[in-house]
């Protein structure tokens, strides 16, 4: 809640009737840069002076209210001014000058008995800011009376400061964009369009945004045989034998690189992200050595933890993983990172800036140089040295010298890696490269005024603050627009220790963002965030806020970040404090749930989807046994236990769906979204009933309209926790028995099932107790199927329908998951998936022009066909018919797609053309024909059989 001066509180508590004045500062179109000019207006009955500025009265006709809620939205406001054609603003508008995108600031002043402005804001000793934003639209209406005097009314539509969030502000891996190139006197020159002056001479993306093909060569020894003869019997005869030998053969392979420009993401915490290739070339004298430069993230990052070569990381997951492939160290429990390759010993430290790492995955030598995106980093010396000697293939092809990659290629603020591949018989193409990145260093502010900026943070508020204040990729808001102590207070709530699990339960601690496996790392909200900078600032801010249940508002002119939280000292409001306009709304029947199914990307599963599923038996009993499932997806949470706690809170919140609306006087000014309220209303039997503020609407006359959301005390981040840390530690190893007898049954012919149904997967349940659901991964699909285990009959098959899938090879991987999140080993099934069979056979398929008494002969030059439409056309859109025509040798003459009609004429001209096509252009016709037809749908639906003639 925005604080106001104690003297203002006393005045407002002792004065029921208030005189308010809105003070408007409207930027004029003549403003430019720092030389902004304004016109100052007020809706008060007389002129008002504030801070030495005169606000003129008599022009402002009306001002609307300003509303904000817990959902990030662009708030709006409108106001009208009126006057004669001689007025300054009216003259400008009537002369065609636009006020669009000009700034506007409105203060709401309280005028005391002495006619002075009451000091309210402790930061300025003046009035509170009512609105700040921009003009986004408007209109003018003229009125000329009988005496010829004309007046005009202008209505301005304004949007608050969140209007500026509706833009994309990311860096593009393109040289022209990076350096701000523009044409000057016919040549490209860097300009102030670069996000930093230093970027103007940074050539790091010079080779990007191009397609490159490289001819790589490598040598292999191939087995050969030669015939060897030997004389026998004094030269009268010979014997022959084959002798094996090896010959060195040079082979060539074309390597295609698409260096298309992309937006550089922002990473906080630890995440796996794909590399963006920005340079590729081979060594001139060693054409099997390929260098590729990949951009990964905005810097400066803490470092790289591991690289994935294709689908395989350099660091082993566990003992089993190390037994099946070439890898090093252990991610599980030990927390090894790629720096082990350079250090030679076990370490959980991230990579070192500029360090070379050597690795061999069994398919050939790989070398990686890591660069963390420092603001002053220098060019990679390994590439500079090669280019200096003209040692690159494309460099020589294009006639370039050392400038091909010299000291100007710094890639400032860009976390990137150089990867050197050796092409050989085991590696004939460049694999996809992705990396586990420990993200951007952020500033963390402390109550004592100190600032730490030496590492990344899992705290969503510090991530949000970094993004909001960045001019390079974020909202570009200056720090002085945030109440810093308020931000610090809210951030501490996210750092409360989660006591629902023990540290040892998180074996992949290093890859969920922890630096060490200590209990103080169990913060209740931990975000590992990727921000797609090709999306708008608005969408990215919204995504972070949703990840920690936060809100941001600027009702008082500051950007105030708040968290949903419980308070033992909420603002207390009695019904008698309101204007009596109370409205209670209850939507509990629609929005309450008794079970939850949530998904997250889990580093313990090689960054594949994991699921959290549980239900509340008490809630289900209240819902009379009906299953009501809440679906959640966590984009920025990768810690299973953080996601589990969040899902539990959201399930509890869903049981509270009552909202309370009413209006209060100006003495409650400063209320903002997410403020805790204790409301008392004797008629309802409420005594300090707990609510959170969901929406605030400040009106011009000082009345404040509120919408409150009911909650219990146990649904918040800072609510009293249930300590599960003393429970048995979940076994890290897989001790959940797998499902049994996994098989696929296609939809039988002639059976009409669900629309587009291919068939059914079925299995017998796991024999492990406490299995709550089954996860089925489907090749080519991101999200798995989730099937709840509601019954415990071990001999009753469980079923998952497969609907609307195209025909072809499909691989299904089935696992059982118990109540603690433990997963069984997978049961895999490869299926040559049939098409979705669910449509009826076409009926009454016939030849219309048959010979009398002989349905096998047609009369006339053409064959006229007809059929009846299938009944499914009434329920399935976009049904069409496929008609195929064959000759006497069963060769297809043509296949025709037919829509919205149920007849087809196979004309004589068609017949002649089809005959000529299959008979080397000879003249003639097909006299014996076979026709067949079936119905099909856009989602893979097909008739279960063909109708034939």
Curated annotation (Swiss-Prot):
Ubiquitinated by the Bil antiviral defense system when this protein is expressed in E.coli MG1655 strain expressing the Bil system. Signal peptide: none annotated. It comes from the Viruses. Induction: Expressed in the late phase of the viral replicative cycle. GO terms for cellular component: virus tail; virus tail, baseplate. Keywords: Late protein, Ubl conjugation, Viral baseplate protein, Viral tail protein, Virion. It is found in: Virion. Forms the simplified baseplate, together with the p132 collar protein, the baseplate tube protein p140 and distal tail protein pb9. Closes the tail tube and, upon infection, opens to form a channel thereby anchoring the tube to the outer membrane. These changes allow the tape measure protein pb2 to be expelled and phage DNA to be transferred to the host. Also forms the start of the central straight fiber, which is continued with the straight fiber protein pb4. Homotrimer. Forms a pseudo-hexameric ring. Interacts with distal tail protein pb9 and straight fiber protein pb4. This is Baseplate hub protein pb3. It comes from Escherichia phage T5 (Enterobacteria phage T5). The gene is D16.
């Amino acid at each position: 809640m925005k604080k106001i001066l104690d003297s203002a509180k006393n005045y407002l508590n002792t004065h029921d009737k208030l005189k308010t004045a809105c003070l408007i500062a409207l930027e004029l179109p003549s403003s430019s840069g720092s030389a902004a000019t304004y016109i100052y207006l007020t809706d008060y009955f007389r002129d008002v002076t504030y801070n030495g500025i005169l606000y003129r009265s008599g022009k402002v006709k009306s001002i609307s209210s300003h509303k904000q809620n817990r959902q990030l939205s662009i708030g709006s406001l409108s106001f009208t001014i009126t006057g004669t054609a001689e007025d300054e603003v009216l003259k400008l508008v009537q002369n065609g000058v636009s006020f669009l995108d000009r700034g506007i600031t409105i203060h709401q002043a309280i005028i005391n008995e002495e006619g002075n402005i009451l000091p309210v804001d402790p930061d300025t000793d003046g009035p509170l800011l009512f609105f700040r934003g921009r003009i986004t639209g408007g209109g003018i209406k003229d009125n000329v009376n009988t005496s010829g005097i004309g007046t005009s009314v202008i209505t301005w539509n304004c949007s608050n400061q969140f209007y500026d969030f509706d833009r994309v502000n990311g860096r593009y891996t393109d040289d022209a964009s990076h350096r701000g190139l523009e044409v000057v006197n016919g040549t490209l020159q860097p300009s102030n369009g670069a996000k930093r002056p230093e970027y103007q001479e940074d050539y790091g993306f010079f080779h990007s945004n191009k397609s490159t093909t490289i001819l790589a060569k490598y040598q292999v020894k191939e087995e050969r045989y030669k015939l060897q003869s030997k004389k026998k019997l004094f030269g009268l005869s010979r014997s022959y034998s084959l002798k094996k030998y090896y010959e060195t053969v040079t082979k060539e392979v074309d390597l295609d690189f698409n260096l298309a420009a992309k937006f550089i993401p922002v990473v906080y915490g630890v995440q796996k992200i794909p590399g963006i290739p920005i340079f590729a070339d081979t060594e001139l004298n060693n054409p099997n050595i390929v260098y590729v430069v990949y951009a990964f993230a905005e810097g400066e990052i803490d470092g790289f933890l591991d690289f994935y070569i294709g689908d395989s990381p350099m660091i082993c997951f566990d003992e089993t993983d190390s037994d099946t492939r070439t890898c090093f160290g252990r991610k599980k429990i030990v927390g090894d990172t790629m720096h082990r390759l350079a250090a030679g010993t076990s370490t959980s430290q991230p990579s070192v800036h500029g360090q070379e790492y050597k690795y061999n995955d069994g398919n050939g030598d790989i070398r990686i140089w890591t660069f963390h995106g420092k603001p002053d980093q220098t060019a990679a010396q390994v590439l500079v040295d090669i280019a200096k000697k003209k040692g690159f293939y494309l460099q020589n092809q294009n006639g370039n010298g050392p400038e091909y990659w010299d000291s100007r290629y710094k890639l400032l603020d860009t976390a990137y890696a150089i990867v050197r591949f050796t092409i050989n018989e085991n590696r004939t193409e460049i694999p996809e490269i992705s990396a586990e990145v420990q993200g951007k260093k952020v500033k963390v502010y402390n109550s004592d005024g100190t600032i730490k900026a030496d590492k990344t943070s899992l705290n969503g508020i510090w991530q949000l603050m970094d993004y909001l204040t960045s001019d390079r990729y974020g909202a570009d808001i200056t720090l002085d627009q945030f109440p810093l102590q308020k931000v610090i207070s809210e951030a501490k709530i996210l750092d409360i220790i989660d006591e629902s699990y023990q540290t040892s339960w998180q074996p992949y601690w290093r890859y969920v963002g922890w630096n060490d496996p200590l209990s103080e790392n169990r913060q209740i909200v931990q975000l590992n965030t990727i921000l797609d900078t090709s999306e708008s600032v608005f969408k990215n801010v919204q995504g972070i806020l949703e990840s920690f249940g936060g809100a941001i508002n600027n009702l008082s002119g500051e950007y105030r970040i708040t968290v949903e939280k419980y308070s033992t000292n909420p603002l207390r409001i009695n019904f008698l404090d309101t204007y009596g306009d109370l409205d209670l709304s209850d939507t509990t029947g629609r929005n309450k749930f008794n079970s939850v199914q949530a998904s997250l990307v889990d580093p313990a599963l090689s960054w594949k989807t994991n699921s959290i599923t549980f239900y509340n038996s008490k809630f289900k009993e209240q819902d009379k046994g009906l299953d009501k499932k809440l679906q959640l997806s966590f984009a920025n949470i990768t810690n299973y236990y953080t996601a589990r706690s969040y899902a539990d809170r959201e399930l509890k919140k869903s049981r509270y769906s009552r909202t309370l609306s009413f209006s209060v006087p100006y003495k409650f000014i400063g209320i903002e979204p997410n403020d805790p309220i204790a409301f008392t209303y004797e008629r309802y039997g409420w005594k300090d009933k707990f609510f959170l503020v969901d929406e605030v609407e400040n009106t011009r006359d000082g009345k404040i309209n509120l919408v409150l959301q009911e909650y219990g005390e146990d649904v918040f981040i800072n609510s009293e926790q249930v300590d599960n840390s003393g429970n048995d530690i979940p076994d890290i190893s897989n001790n959940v028995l797998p499902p049994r007898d996994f098989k696929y049954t296609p939809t039988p012919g002639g059976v009409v099932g669900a629309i587009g149904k291919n068939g059914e997967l079925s299995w017998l349940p796991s024999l492990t107790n406490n299995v709550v659901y089954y996860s089925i991964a489907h090749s080519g699909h991101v999200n798995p199927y989730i099937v709840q285990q509601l019954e415990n009959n071990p001999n009753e098959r469980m079923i998952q329908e497969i609907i609307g899938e195209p025909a072809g090879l499909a691989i299904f991987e089935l696992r059982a998951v118990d109540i603690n999140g433990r997963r069984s080993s997978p049961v895999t099934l490869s299926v040559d998936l049939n098409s979705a069979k669910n449509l009826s056979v076409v009926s009454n398929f016939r030849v219309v022009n048959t010979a009398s008494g002989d349905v096998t002969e047609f009369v006339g030059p053409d064959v006229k066909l007809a059929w009846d439409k299938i009944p499914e056309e009434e329920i399935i859109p976009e049904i069409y018919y496929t008609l195929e025509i064959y000759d006497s040798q069963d060769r297809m003459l043509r296949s025709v797609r037919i829509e919205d009609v149920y007849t087809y004429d196979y004309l004589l001209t068609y017949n002649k053309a089809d005959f000529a096509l299959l008979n080397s252009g000879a003249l003639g016709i097909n006299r014996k024909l076979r026709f067949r037809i079936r119905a099909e749908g856009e989602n893979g639906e097909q008739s279960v059989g063909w109708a034939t003639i």
